[in-house]
């Protein structure tokens, strides 16, 4: 399972010393009274006490001791010891909490060399005062490290972040509101805090950065972003020219769009984009690729430090910095030890880096040997990723379905099953049972070819509105399967079962159904194929609808009722006594042209106007003959 932050691993010290946290360390430094109670002197305790008489070797201490560090304990350390402690935290890749970092920063010496800064944890530097580094060279080095730190450790608009931003701009030589791409890279995460005046003057540089910022924009930033987008300036141009990829790129800026901007975006673009994110929610604010651009930048600039490349997935990776995970961990190592990836409590951020590494290792999709070992890691895979897979084993499908149960992963599950069917797989009883809690509307998401692999027994589970978004081709295939599934059912029970699938029924099927007085409701009638419906006579439709025949009047101006009316003799419609209009007047010919075959324009089925237009030509031809 994943945890929001790294937690101490139980038993990582190998003795009860971890449960006493940092007390023994403080005792070893000689400024805490001796414990009144006697404790068992383990080898680790002896090492701590030995530190009093010599140089303190913090790097040799167990990781668990650092994780329990308290402010009161740190305040008793000398500045030299505090610096050595901080360096050990960096060396051991230990993740400290905010209050621990702040306390430790207060005890550091006021003068630090570049070499000493390099040896400190990056996130610890966020709590240092930039005034400690006067001069262009010193401040440039300090802020080059800050740009790689996770500034979100500090709350947005906190005094510490404001102090860092002011210092960074001054060090970079920015005195107006214009910043370059180089300036933005130098600021790193601090670029997310630049006020609206900077956004207005440097929109081409800053808007892509703001789109990737994790937190909400402040009022000034949001106003400036809206003005830039409304004006059609770079980098996105006028809203009327936006595409689906533009909306994807906007990401965190979408929330500031106002009504005037939204109305300027082409409607078909909005529709396509909304359909895309409904199928793949991970496209909206995806954290796999854009949330932390600094990780990719760090990887390009830094190689894996000597001795840091792991040969096994273990707890030590928890304490790697994110850039070290990117630089040092190999995708094939992760693929071969997915059981350990799932067992160790990595953070969500670390797991996202692991996924990025796997995606780079297998750009054409994960092999099935890896897929069957994904376990809980399956939760971090998007439907788009799954569509690249080739899954042939029902055991693989069943394993991942168990992992996804209760996790709100319908989109991933549907993509997985579709992938399996595409590879020639068949839905067995276990897979069908695992899909019980997912609405069967997923049948519409499969390709028509995949539907042939669905067992007919599944049709018994389809609900009344499950197929509402299915295409005509889907319905035609599913109707045939439903007929097979319900072949031993008759009467009204048969109609209740087959009703959901009637959108795929042919004219002959509807004609046969009309002989059973099924009393079809108008909602079902409206879902019938137009091509099948228009060939039915008034008497046949009357038998189909039964007591619901009067509902035709409310739908006479809408398809498919309108299409059916155009093909009927008006005198037959009059016999219903409903006042239906639009039929063919008495004495006129009924011409049955197949428009789709005769005309390449794909016009709708013939109405009376089309028929009337041809009658004079036909009469002239008859006179000539």
UniProtKB/Swiss-Prot annotation:
Cellular compartments per GO CC: cell surface; extracellular space; Golgi apparatus; plasma membrane; side of membrane
Signal sequence segment: 1-35
Modification after translation, per record: Proteolytically cleaved by a furin-like convertase to generate megakaryocyte-potentiating factor (MPF), and the cleaved form of mesothelin.
Alphabetic keyword roster: Cell adhesion, Cell membrane, Cleavage on pair of basic residues, Disulfide bond, Glycoprotein, Golgi apparatus, GPI-anchor, Lipoprotein, Membrane, Phosphoprotein, Secreted, Signal
Main localisation: membrane
Propeptide section residues: 601-625
Membrane topology type: Lipid-anchor; GPI-anchor
UniProt-annotated location(s): Cell membrane; Golgi apparatus
InterPro entries listed in its UniProt record: Mesothelin (IPR010335), Stereocilin-rel (IPR026664)
Lipidated residues (GPI-anchor amidated serine): 600
Keyword Phosphoprotein belongs to the record: yes
Organism superkingdom: Eukaryota
One record GO biological process: cell-matrix adhesion
Family: Belongs to the mesothelin family.
Job of this protein: Membrane-anchored forms may play a role in cellular adhesion.
Subunit structure: Interacts with MUC16.
PANTHER family: MESOTHELIN, STEREOCILIN RELATED
Full protein name: Mesothelin
Upper taxonomic lineage: Eukaryota, Metazoa, Chordata, Craniata, Vertebrata
